[in-house]
């Protein structure tokens, strides 16, 4: 079976989203000043409407298809873990690279609602793609995602101008393992890197006394299906297990401001050509998604 690598297409390839044709259309997707201020103070922003019910259902169909371990396109994933949990009694599906495989998970990168918000939260700058992720916690036995900072896994790129968008494909609640945040923790600097699917609170050992006090008061970011949460790459976050009777599925889009460079002479993602240390991140696998000056 011949497989088309959708990373070669830098733009919408389906009718799932419509690209704005005017400045007014783009402005209709803008976050408020209050929302941007909240993000800058707390390091995250939750409850941003990102997908319609129709878009959610189409993306769920894509996810069901590619989650099959026997699917012929698995060679295009950067990483594929049908169960990444370190606890044998729980399951955490985690994969990177779905944008290369299905129309829906490709086109979410060019969702204008996402792009406008991402540009604003990065400082009204052009937005470049880093990579995507899928997280799936099945009912009753969905595993945890340990408290961590995203950038602790991304030190092979610099400077720190990265942003994460986490989008719910199911209602995300305390019961099914919603994201939790420590407000203001993006100002703590870079902490050691934990095992992502290991002990939930393993990061506690690396916190000072003041940080431990704040760590004891996490904010649960419960969101509805189709809503997104944005967070800074240094914001401390994690999620508990899914003890509910329903799945908790989500996709993640990781981006950075245009101009971020490689800080490694090793491959930045599995199967992707090396971007030499010191060179700008760009090309087939790291496309420019949105430039506010050109689009608006």
Predicted regions and their residues:
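Short, P/G- and charge-enriched loop/turn segments at secondary-structure junctions
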Residues: 150-155, 216-218
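Conserved hydrophobic/aromatic beta-strand scaffold that supports enzyme active sites
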Residues: 28, 44-46, 164-168, 218-220, ...
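Short, structured patches in soluble enzyme cores that scaffold and shape functional sites
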Residues: 133, 149-151, 167-171, 183
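Short, conserved beta-strand element in jelly-roll/cupin
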Residues: 155-174, 222-223, 230, 254-258
């Amino acid at each position: 079976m011949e497989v088309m690598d959708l990373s070669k297409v830098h733009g919408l390839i389906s009718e799932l989203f419509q690209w704005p044709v005017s400045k007014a259309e783009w402005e209709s997707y803008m976050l408020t000043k209050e929302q941007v201020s909240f993000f800058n103070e707390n390091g995250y922003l939750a409850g941003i409407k990102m997908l319609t019910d129709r878009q959610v259902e189409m993306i769920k169909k894509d996810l069901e298809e590619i989650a099959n371990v026997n699917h012929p396109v698995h060679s295009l994933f950067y990483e594929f873990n049908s169960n990444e949990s370190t606890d044998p009694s729980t399951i955490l599906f985690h994969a990177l690279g779905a944008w290369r495989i299905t129309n829906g998970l490709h086109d979410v990168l060019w969702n204008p609602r996402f792009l406008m918000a991402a540009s604003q939260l990065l400082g009204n700058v052009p937005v470049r793609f880093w990579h995507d992720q899928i997280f799936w916690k099945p009912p009753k036995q969905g595993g945890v995602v340990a408290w961590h900072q995203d950038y602790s896994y991304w030190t092979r790129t610099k400077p720190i101008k990265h942003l994460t968008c986490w989008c719910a494909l199911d209602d995300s609640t305390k019961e099914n393992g919603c994201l939790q945040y420590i407000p203001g923790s993006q100002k703590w600097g870079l902490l050691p890197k934990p095992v992502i699917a290991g002990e939930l609170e393993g990061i506690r050992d690396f916190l000072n006394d003041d940080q431990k006090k704040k760590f004891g008061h996490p904010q649960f970011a419960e969101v509805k299906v189709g809503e997104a949460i944005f967070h800074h790459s240094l914001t401390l976050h994690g999620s508990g297990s899914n003890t509910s009777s329903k799945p908790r599925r989500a996709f993640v889009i990781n981006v950075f401001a245009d101009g971020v460079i490689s800080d490694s002479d090793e491959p930045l993602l599995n199967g992707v050509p090396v971007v030499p240390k010191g060179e700008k991140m760009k090309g087939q696998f790291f496309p420019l998604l949105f430039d506010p000056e050109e689009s608006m």
